[in-house]
């Protein structure tokens, strides 16, 4: 019997010694997700470096896996609140998962607060849009530039894509060609496209004679946009479901197109594209 026990130990011991502990498994998993796509040191070395990366690569209004500074999963709400504190920036993580992963990185206390201030402002705007998800689209009744009446009943049975804009908004106009192509792809599907403009009917008609925009255009919508929807940044893009519930809110055309396509969570700008001038940090 003693010899049998010795023989069993000879065969079983290697199996026991090779088995990973739960702690070791967690370390491996963390190693798979903690590699940032962009160098943290590079980003915080210069405000313009960070802003160019953040503007082109980070979409806080998209769906993403949120990781705290210890690489632990947290809710999107908690993630945005951490960013609002001004103590962190976020960097996309190199991951093989389909869902984009963002991780929090703490800013040095002695760093110039320019990055912190802009990060706080951007995260706050994203948080305000995030809170809109799941809420009912406000009641409205309006006539578009062609005399067709619209109300909440228009949402029934279809997904509605909405854009806010005004004529002198350069960013609003710059994305119209991209949105026209988007409409062409989905015009025969159960998706409709509405735009809420702050301008009056006549200026809009004059604008549309020279500039094609394939969304239905609703004039004089500043009250709906800024007082009911509480949106102050233009353009903003919303997806409303067939029950009139706001499903998603985005800041860029590329993000809403990507969401509808369900191909990627965010269409990233070409590396040759330049970010717009950094916003004031104050």
Language-model segments: which ranges?
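Conserved redox-active cysteine motifs that mediate thiol-disulfide chemistry
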Residues: 156, 163-181, 185
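Short, internal strand/loop/helix patches
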Residues: 194, 205-243, 251
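Short pre-active-site segment immediately N-terminal to redox-active cysteine/selenocysteine motifs
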Residues: 158, 165-168, 200, 233
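Thiol-/selenol-based redox modules, centered on thioredoxin-like
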Residues: 117-122, 239-282
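N-proximal helix/coil linker or "cap" segments that precede and/or mark the start of modular domains
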Residues: 42-54, 80-81, 86-90, 94-139
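Bacterial Sec-dependent N-terminal signal peptides
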Residues: 1-28, 281-282
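N-terminal low-complexity, Pro/Thr/Ser-rich intrinsically disordered segments
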Residues: 24-59
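A short beta-strand-turn-helix
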Residues: 139-160
């Amino acid at each position: 019997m003693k010899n049998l026990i010795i023989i069993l130990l000879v065969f079983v011991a290697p199996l026991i010694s090779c088995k990973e502990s739960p702690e070791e498994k967690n370390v491996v998993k963390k190693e798979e997700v903690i590699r940032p796509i962009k160098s943290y040191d590079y980003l915080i070395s210069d405000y313009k470096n960070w802003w160019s990366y953040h503007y082109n690569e980070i979409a806080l209004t998209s769906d993403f896996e949120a990781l705290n500074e210890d690489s632990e999963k947290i809710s999107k709400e908690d993630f945005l609140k951490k960013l609002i504190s001004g103590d962190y920036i976020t960097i996309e993580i190199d991951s093989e998962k389909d869902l984009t992963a963002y991780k929090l990185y703490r800013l040095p206390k002695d760093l110039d607060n320019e990055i912190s201030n802009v990060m706080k402002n951007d995260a706050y705007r994203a948080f305000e849009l995030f809170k809109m998800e799941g809420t009912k689209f406000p009641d409205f009744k309006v006539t578009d530039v062609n005399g067709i009446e619209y109300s909440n009943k228009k949402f029934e049975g279809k997904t509605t894509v909405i854009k806010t804009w005004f004529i002198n908004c350069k960013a609003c106009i710059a994305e119209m060609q991209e949105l026209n192509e988007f409409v062409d792809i989905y015009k025969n599907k159960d998706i409709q496209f509405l735009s809420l403009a702050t301008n009056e009917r006549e200026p809009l008609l004059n604008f549309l004679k020279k500039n094609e925009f394939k969304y239905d255009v609703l004039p004089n919508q500043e009250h709906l946009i800024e007082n009911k929807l509480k949106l102050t940044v233009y353009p903003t893009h919303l997806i409303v479901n067939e029950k009139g519930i706001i499903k998603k809110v985005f800041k860029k055309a590329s993000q809403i197109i990507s969401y509808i396509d369900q191909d990627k969570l965010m269409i990233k700008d070409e590396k040759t594209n330049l970010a717009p001038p950094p916003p004031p940090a104050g």
